[in-house]
Amino acid sequence: MKAVVYAGTRNLYPHMVMAMKSLLINSPVDKIYLIIEDDEFPFPVPDCIETIRVDPYLFFDPHSPNMGIQFTPFALIRAATAKLLPDDLDRVLQLDVDTIVEDSLNELWEMDLTGKYFAAVPEYLGKFKPYGPIYFNCGVMMLNLNEIRKTGIETDLIKFLNTEYVPYGDQDAWNKLGIDKAAIMPVRFNEAFCTGYTENPAIVHYAGRIDWASNPSVYRAKYLQKYRGAGWP
């Protein structure tokens, strides 16, 4: 089954709608899971979209060092994705809400992730590589849920984020603890200012620039004009 998961707080719900529309228009999937803080999603959505209500403090102490970071608590919750999704789901594509899908993602479900926790695109911009020679951007991740559950690494990720401050939430946890079992994803599946640019991006990632209305990038027009007024396929 082709499944995708997004996570976010209430202020991000409108961006989730745009992200999901772009996904279903350009690369239809069987199921979309929304990890959110409400019982129901407040916008009309297709039947393939299922909400999972999660208390932001389910896995993380409100006084943990990462609760005051620049991102919402759901940037930590994503470290526990494998604990929240159905046990019979063997892999899932985890997407940030500030992503727009522009082309088919079928290649990602065909990736061989045997023995790997995830596949993602490395960052190339800057010298921020605190955990080794490579640093992955985790805004687009194909998660191998079978391997994650088998090893129990999600428990280690949660413990790490509850005890050690990191600037980028679950992304730092994965780069610290899971990098030895990571596969490299082609850059066209996570085109961002920190990963690189291609002529035919499949996923455009704003990478934190969530104020799209004031973002002067060329991709702002795609969001505003193409998906804001688009209907569900």
Features from the language model and the residues they span:
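Glycine-rich phosphate-binding "P-loop"
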Residues: K2-L12, P62-M67
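Short, acidic, metal-binding catalytic loop of nucleotide-sugar glycosyltransferases
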Residues: S22-V29
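Short, polar loop motifs at secondary-structure junctions
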Residues: I36-F41, Y124, R188-E191
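Active-site-proximal specificity loops/subdomain of glycosyltransferases
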Residues: F41-L84
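GT-A fold catalytic core of metal-dependent nucleotide-sugar glycosyltransferases
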Residues: R53, F74-L125, P133-Y135, M141-L143
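A short, conserved beta-to-alpha structural element at the edge of catalytic cores
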Residues: F118-Y135, P216-R220, A230-P233
